[in-house]
């Protein structure tokens, strides 16, 4: 069943209507699932590096609070398959953007293994799952599960833009 969508280009959807299935598509970006058992509400978020820098987790929790009365402490969160830190090289420019959202201590955990990339510039390995886990914790979510599945390393079963390019 398809319903008309009054939106385009969003990185999150939510409902509290039983029987409605929400679907989001991801490549190497993370799906973040928020479930509020007290209000029978769910949200699905698309957390790429840009969404993570913009703290889509807090934005999703705030939308749920306003719409359903959700409290972060009641939320059960799940982080789905996405690219792992070992496979996700990012630039110094991306790291600088993250520094606007995360503390120095968190930055040391999220960005590891500084090295020179093929372009001769400084690059880092980014742990996107850990970054979103920290955002969830900082927002007050206490129950967080992360399956730890890397899309890049499992590209035969899951789509990975970095492993497969644009073909789907």
Region spans (language model):
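Active-site microenvironment for binding and transforming phosphate-containing groups
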Residues: 1-168
């Amino acid at each position: 069943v398809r319903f008309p969508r009054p939106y385009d280009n969003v990185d999150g959807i939510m409902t509290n209507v039983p029987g409605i299935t929400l679907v989001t598509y991801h490549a190497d970006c993370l799906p973040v699932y928020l479930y509020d058992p007290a209000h029978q509400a769910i949200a699905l978020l698309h957390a790429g590096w840009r969404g993570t820098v913009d703290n889509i987790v807090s934005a999703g929790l705030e939308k749920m609070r306003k719409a359903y009365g959700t409290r972060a402490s009641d939320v059960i969160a799940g982080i789905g398959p996405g690219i792992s830190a070992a496979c996700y090289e990012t630039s110094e420019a991306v790291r600088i953007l993250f520094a606007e959202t995360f503390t120095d201590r968190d930055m040391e955990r999220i960005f590891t293994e500084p090295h020179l990339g093929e372009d001769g510039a400084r690059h880092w390995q980014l742990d996107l799952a850990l970054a979103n886990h920290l955002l969830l914790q900082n927002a007050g979510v206490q129950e967080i599960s992360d399956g730890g599945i890397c899309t890049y390393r499992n590209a035969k079963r899951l789509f990975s833009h970095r492993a497969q390019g644009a073909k789907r």
